[in-house]
């Protein structure tokens, strides 16, 4: 086992601080409407240009192992905030640094780190409560557009497209971001339920120009079983042919004799039919077929339940106004399933979403929910170059997450103002003893986001903070226009969830770092045992170490 190097007490905390500062300095330059870009070298392809805090943070690894520990902990703040709220990563990083720096001064002066942590936790609880009371619901499309615009670094086109998408597919709908072929950024909305399986054979196509099969008012056979023999299917096919309606077959697989017979009947005009493989795999396939059955009012043909093709009647089949099938996707529009059955299915999926622990499973469940409830919107991001495309796509994804957060928990004034408006509530909080100093740490840290926004805009942060504190409500500093005004009316708003998550994550990690008393890392190769700098190795401050 390799020898370890240990830092204790203040030496350990100062090493952490150096790492926190390095990462924070790189991330904080992106904060606010006048924040700058960061260029990140890639081992292959062109460099990435970004103004997204978490993208910058994820790229940072420091050579000094002790400093790197501090940087990695703050990186965790940024990525957790991004995962939960989708935005606010730079704010979270700035807050984490401020809390740790202020706390470190007090620990060095002899205050108890554990009491400071308790004070910080109590202060954060009060501020979160205050943010919730300041919060207003996003009632209209205009507010959603404003949130999207702010998160997309002031790009009004992106804000408007996201608001349109959310209006069309609703709160539960799925909105995906893809790369467009041209320069324009556009929105496509898919009505009804779409799944990623196309026709089994191109002979089923009804529109040669578009290479798609469009079936109006069809019957829909939904089966978990493979369809390989035609003998069992003949009674059902005869019933469908007599009805004069088209038929869609969605099954585990359609092969051999069955596929050949269907194609021949289609070509001869005996039966307008199209065969599609069932979506998904394993248990997820069964659930998705059940979703389609509920939506179309049909029954899933399952061996587990003893169903047989030869006993099926038209009442066992689903119905829809229209089904469109291309080589990659199938879209079912206006299924005839009952409202009660669909709502029951939706309720079941929501319960599963609440109880599932895997992010992947949750994402798949949300996709299924969206297909039953609202539909799917696709934002196609256009740009002139690949570098611009990457940067723009990242901005659209950020803005999309922020608008979802705004719809979920409402909005507060942006530009760091919401944190300042929470300060009076902290004045009343007196936990007593050394915990009061923990409250003071948060009081100071809450001013940092606005200070950094102002400094990135080229003005003195302290002056801006004092001026904003003299006002009330949404009065604040608009860094884009460099005027003091009502930020809500000016469209400078932030999702409450983003502000809350940024503060909670920053305080959680920073207060843990404050209680650090020792750090252990592998000794760099070639470093002398005494702790001084070895040949060609960085000096880790070994002279200050306690053994």
UniProtKB/Swiss-Prot annotation:
ATP binds at residues 30-33, 51, 87-91, 415, 494. It is found in: Cytoplasm. Residues 524-547 are annotated as: Disordered. Disulfide bonds: none annotated. Its main location: cytoplasm. Its EC number is 5.6.1.7. Signal peptide: none annotated. The keyword Transmembrane does not apply. Keywords: ATP-binding, Chaperone, Cytoplasm, Isomerase, Nucleotide-binding. It comes from the Bacteria. InterPro entries: Chaperonin_Cpn60_CS (IPR018370), Cpn60/GroEL (IPR001844), Cpn60/GroEL/TCP-1 (IPR002423), GroEL-like_apical_dom_sf (IPR027409), GROEL-like_equatorial_sf (IPR027413), TCP-1-like_intermed_sf (IPR027410). It holds the Pfam family Cpn60_TCP1. GO terms for molecular function: ATP binding; ATP-dependent protein folding chaperone; isomerase activity; unfolded protein binding. It catalyses: ATP + H2O + a folded polypeptide = ADP + phosphate + an unfolded polypeptide. One of its GO terms (cellular component) is cytoplasm. GO terms for biological process: protein refolding. Together with its co-chaperonin GroES, plays an essential role in assisting protein folding. The GroEL-GroES system forms a nano-cage that allows encapsulation of the non-native substrate proteins and provides a physical environment optimized to promote and accelerate protein folding. Forms a cylinder of 14 subunits composed of two heptameric rings stacked back-to-back. Interacts with the co-chaperonin GroES. Belongs to the chaperonin (HSP60) family. This is Chaperonin GroEL 1. It comes from Myxococcus xanthus (strain DK1622).
């Amino acid at each position: 086992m390799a020898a370890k190097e240990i830092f204790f007490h203040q030496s350990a905390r100062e090493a952490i601080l150096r790492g926190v500062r390095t990462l924070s300095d790189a991330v904080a330059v992106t904060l606010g409407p006048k924040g700058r870009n960061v260029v990140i070298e890639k081992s292959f392809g062109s460099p990435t240009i970004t103004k997204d805090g978490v993208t910058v943070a994820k790229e940072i690894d420091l050579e000094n192992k002790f400093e790197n520990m501090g940087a990695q902990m703050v990186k965790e703040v940024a990525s957790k905030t991004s995962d939960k709220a989708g935005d606010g990563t730079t704010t979270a990083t700035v807050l984490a640094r401020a809390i740790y720096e202020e706390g470190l001064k007090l620990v060095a002066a002899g205050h108890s780190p554990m009491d400071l942590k308790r004070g910080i936790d109590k202060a954060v609880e009060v501020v979160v409560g205050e943010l919730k009371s300041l919060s207003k619901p996003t009632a209209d499309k205009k507010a959603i557009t404003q949130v999207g615009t702010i998160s997309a670094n002031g790009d009004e086109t992106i804000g408007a497209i996201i608001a349109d998408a959310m209006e069309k597919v609703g709160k539960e709908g799925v909105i995906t971001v893809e790369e467009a072929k041209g320069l324009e950024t556009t929105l496509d909305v898919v009505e009804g339920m779409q799944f990623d399986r196309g026709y089994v054979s191109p002979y089923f196509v009804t529109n040669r120009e578009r290479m798609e099969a469009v079936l109006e008012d069809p019957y829909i056979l939904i089966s978990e079983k493979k369809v390989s023999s035609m003998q069992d299917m003949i009674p059902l096919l005869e019933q469908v042919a007599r009805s004069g309606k088209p038929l869609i077959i969605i099954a585990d697989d359609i092969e051999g004799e069955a596929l050949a017979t269907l194609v021949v009947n289609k070509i001869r005009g005996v039966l307008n039919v199209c065969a599609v493989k069932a979506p998904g795999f394993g248990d997820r396939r069964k659930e998705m077929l059940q979703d389609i059955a509920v939506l179309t009012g049909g029954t899933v043909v399952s061996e587990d339940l003893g169903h047989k093709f030869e006993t099926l009647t038209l009442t066992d089949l689903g119905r829809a106004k229209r089904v469109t099938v291309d080589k990659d996707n199938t879209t079912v529009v206006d299924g005839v399933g009952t409202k009660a059955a669909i709502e029951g299915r939706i309720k079941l999926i929501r319960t599963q979403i609440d109880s599932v622990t895997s992010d992947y499973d949750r994402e798949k469940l949300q996709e299924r929910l969206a297909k039953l409830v609202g539909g799917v919107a696709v934002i196609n991001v256009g740009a002139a170059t690949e570098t611009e495309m990457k940067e723009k796509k990242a901005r659209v994804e950020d803005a999309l997450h922020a608008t979802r957060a705004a719809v979920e928990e409402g909005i507060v004034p942006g530009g760091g103002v919401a944190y300042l408006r929470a300060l009076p509530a902290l004045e009343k909080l007196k936990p007593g003893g050394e915990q009061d100093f923990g409250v003071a740490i948060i009081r100071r840290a809450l001013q940092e986001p606005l200070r950094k926004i102002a400094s990135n805009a080229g003005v003195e942060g302290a002056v801006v903070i004092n001026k904003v504190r003299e006002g009330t409500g949404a009065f604040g500093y608009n860094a884009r226009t460099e005027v003091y005004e009502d930020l809500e009316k000016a469209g400078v708003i932030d999702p409450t969830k983003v502000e809350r998550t940024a503060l909670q994550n920053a305080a959680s990690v920073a207060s843990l770092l404050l209680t650090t008393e020792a750090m252990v890392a592998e000794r760099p190769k070639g470093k002398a045992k005494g702790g001084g700098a070895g040949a060609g190795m960085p000096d880790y401050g070994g002279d200050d170490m306690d053994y």
